[in-house]
Curated annotation (Swiss-Prot):
Cited Gene3D superfamilies: 1.10.720.60, HAD superfamily/HAD-like
CDD domains reported for this sequence: HAD_EP
Stated name of the protein: Enolase-phosphatase E1
Subunit structure: Monomer.
Pathway: Amino-acid biosynthesis; L-methionine biosynthesis via salvage pathway; L-methionine from S-methyl-5-thio-alpha-D-ribose 1-phosphate: step 3/6; Amino-acid biosynthesis; L-methionine biosynthesis via salvage pathway; L-methionine from S-methyl-5-thio-alpha-D-ribose 1-phosphate: step 4/6
Organism lineage string: Bacteria, Pseudomonadati, Pseudomonadota, Gammaproteobacteria, Enterobacterales
Catalytic reaction equation(s): 5-methylsulfanyl-2,3-dioxopentyl phosphate + H2O = 1,2-dihydroxy-5-(methylsulfanyl)pent-1-en-3-one + phosphate
Organism expressing this protein natively: Citrobacter koseri (strain ATCC BAA-895 / CDC 4225-83 / SGSC4696)
Assigned keywords, A-Z: Amino-acid biosynthesis, Hydrolase, Magnesium, Metal-binding, Methionine biosynthesis
Matches recorded under InterPro entries: Enolase-ppase_E1, HAD-like_sf, HAD-SF_hydro_IA, HAD_sf
NCBIfam families tied to this protein: enolase-ppase, HAD-SF-IA-v1
Length: 229
């Protein structure tokens, strides 16, 4: 039986256009001024130091780091430092009511149902844990963070690496075969399956012909009790 469900965010619980058309531009417009103003204050100072280590340039100036961050955004680089800074900037946007975290309408009822069935729910996204909590804490449906038992980001490992899913299974103390991973990206599902997890691919638009994973269009198409472990 399935004892835990780990879900992706972009394209799975939330429209990817919310991230790319709302969140990313919001952070991009404010990034340079934000970093310049807070470069000597924590946690930004430590994040910038981590970025210097990430790019192997310990003497990089703040201006050079800002340029690097813009390059990372252009490349959609899954940089832990970039994600951390974006999360801090987004916090202000959520708190100020500039936007709310998008949820597909089928998501909340399914999460509540699975939680009531005794299934532990987790989030795994390339966005920082802080950013994940903001999206679900200030969602279209209000604060739903109480539904989740934990959150994972790139600190646990990259989403297309098999070891990341082994790490998650070990961390939550559930056998991989009793964990269901939900994502719209088949390469992530491949990695999870190789680690022994059960997988389902969310198809919110056109089908993915390159994928060999079972596909569903929305959360209410998913019945964890029918998934054999």
């Amino acid at each position: 039986m399935i004892r835990a469900i780990v879900t992706d965010i972009e394209g799975t619980t939330s429209d990817i256009r919310f991230v790319h058309n709302v969140l990313f531009p919001y952070a991009r417009e404010r990034l340079a001024a934000f970093v310049t103003a807070r470069q000597y204050a924590e946690p930004v100072k430590s994040i910038l130091d981590n970025l210097r280590n990430e790019i192997a340039r310990p003497d990089a100036s703040t201006a050079e780091l800002i340029e690097t961050l813009f390059t990372f955004m252009d490349e959609d680089r899954k940089s832990t430092a970039l994600k951390a800074l974006q999360g801090i900037i987004w916090h202000d946007g959520y708190v100020n009511g500039d936007f709310t975290g998008h949820l597909y309408p089928d998501v909340l009822p399914a999460l509540e149902k699975w939680k009531a069935q005794g299934i532990d729910l987790y989030v795994y996204s390339s966005g920082s844990v802080a950013a994940q909590k903001l999206l679900f804490g200030y969602s279209d449906e209000g604060d739903i963070t109480h539904l989740f038992s934990g959150y994972f980001d790139t600190h646990i490992g990259a989403k297309r690496e098999t070891q990341s899913y082994r790490n998650i299974a070990s961390y939550i103390g559930v056998a991989p075969s009793q964990i269901l991973f939900l994502s719209d990206v088949y390469q992530e599902l491949d990695a999870a399956e190789e680690a022994g997890l059960r997988t389902l691919q969310l198809i919110r638009g056109e089908g993915d012909g390159a994928s060999r994973h079972h596909q569903v269009h929305q959360f209410d198409d998913i019945n964890p009790e029918q998934i054999l472990s």
